[in-house]
Amino acid sequence: MNIFNQLKQDIIVASKQLYNNQAIANTATIDIPKDSFNGDLSSNVAMIIAAKESIAPREVALKFKEVLITLPYIASIEIAGPGFINFTIKADSWQASIKDILQHEEKFFEIDIDKSRNINIEYVSANPTGPMHIGHARGAVYGDVLARILQKVSYSVTKEYYVNDAGSQINDLVSTVLLRYKEALGEQITIPAGLYPGEYLIPLGQILAKEYGNKLLTMNYDERFKIIKSFAVEKMLDLNRKDLADLGIKHDIFFSEQSLHDKGEIEETVKLLESMGLIYEGTLPAPKGKIHEEWDNRVQKLFKSTKYGDSQDRPIEKADGSWSYFASDLAYAKDKIERGANHLIYVLGADHSGYVKRIEAIVKALGKEQVKVDVKICQLVNFVENGVPVKMSKRLGSFASVQDVNNEVGKDIIRFMMLTRQNDKPLDFDLVKVKEQSRENPIFYVQYAHVRTISILSKARELMPESYNNFESGKYDLSLLSSEEEIEIIKLLVSWTKTLEASAKYFEPHRIAFYLINLASKFHSMWNFGKENSEYRFVIESNKELTLARLALASAIQKVIASGLEVIGVEPMNKM
């Protein structure tokens, strides 16, 4: 029995019995109180029902208490504050949870959540102009782990990468590759400022020279541009795919911006919005701080973005008459919705924080308020090595790429460390710290806890084979896990599903990293206490019954840590 799930179901049943309203009760929360004197679990159901029924919350809470106190796993119920219902759970119910984790793991960790949501999550979407730098890693890991979490709680999820292959930076890429091609043919070249001087484009020039000789130089501009662009973009995408794969990240779809232009999808989207009365010709006010004479006050086609909460309407055409990047965004959102997505999630870098309102406006308009949209911003990573910041710029030709850092510390460290702060807070990534074997290094601390649980089970198998066989057969008395420390860690184990659910609900993967660090800390404390007090050790040869119970506890800890690490795409270590 998962106590969180069971209590939620019993509250819903009680709500139907008392107020014939189980739908509202389903929105109630069940949380772990910050202060232990408020019980083990707390619910706000009384206040939700009271608001609907126009009754005093404490009166509602008292009625719930009368019904719920009869449940076999409830020790006591107290009403607190404006109407919170605080529950104390019987110790044997907590203890029994260990057996459920070990014998019914899949069912125990099952989360009953709305499965009608079809989520499209777009993340990374780095310009295909070179190797991915470490600044992209945070959004890549955040988006990938969030997608894994959403899939874990049974949502349908499409992981998408938007390939920006129609902008000015692609033109710069083509110009640079053309120069590298000429260089491969023996010409002396200079890479002008604004292009890409990195050596990673030299092989592309060599490949083109080998395949075409000097034929590209005899072609007209458009023909040559098309060949080099197609070749260079695909090679850079291959590079990005490999960088992502080495981080354990695989997208379902790589969607080309250029395809929106080629298939006329932008024109279709504009016509649709015109039919909805959302496109008009007008002028925009000058940006703050601009001298009026410097502002191009031309009449242009605008999307009524302000109707949906944006700060200003958005132009869909550039001064030369070509479609704006915003027009591509409109068509891209329409394409996602037409493919069946009813919830769009965009993961953007800190430099795109100004895009939040305009993206929300796009989806609200095209989704006709029926499609959900969330835009999540990942703040900067302060990447340092021995306290010295690493410069990150493709244009400078020397930067810390994802591959550089992956080669240095490995994907698991990168993935875990990118989750050690909330996504909208800056993150310090220190290469020295992440390789330390100390409690100050969170990934080591969590992995070491997993290794120690494996060690406990191995030691018991070696020293007490008969007892270990009994443990594997489920012959253990969990009532022996009665110390305050043991009950507290059992409560934490049971709350794993709650953490996973909250991570999915609030789009906060860092909650899982925080949970694992907390669980590892409590486990290490128990381990260290046993080193000083032999009666608290996990394996006690003179006390087989207690050893069996603690083997069950150690095994449950191992399973939960492994489950948490697997959700965030980190491989649990069995030895160090």
Swiss-Prot record:
GO terms for cellular component: cytoplasm. Gene3D superfamilies: Arginyl tRNA synthetase N-terminal domain, HUPs, Isoleucyl-tRNA Synthetase, Domain 1. GO terms for biological process: arginyl-tRNA aminoacylation. GO terms for molecular function: arginine-tRNA ligase activity; ATP binding. A motif ('HIGH' region) lies at residues 126-136. It catalyses: tRNA(Arg) + L-arginine + ATP = L-arginyl-tRNA(Arg) + AMP + diphosphate. InterPro entries: aa-tRNA-synth_I_CS, Arg-tRNA-ligase, Arg-tRNA-synth_N, Arg-tRNA-synth_N_sf, ArgRS_core, DALR_anticod-bd, Rossmann-like_a/b/a_fold, tRNAsynth_Ia_anticodon-bd. Keywords: Aminoacyl-tRNA synthetase, ATP-binding, Cytoplasm, Ligase, Nucleotide-binding, Protein biosynthesis. Its EC number is 6.1.1.19. Monomer. This is Arginine--tRNA ligase.
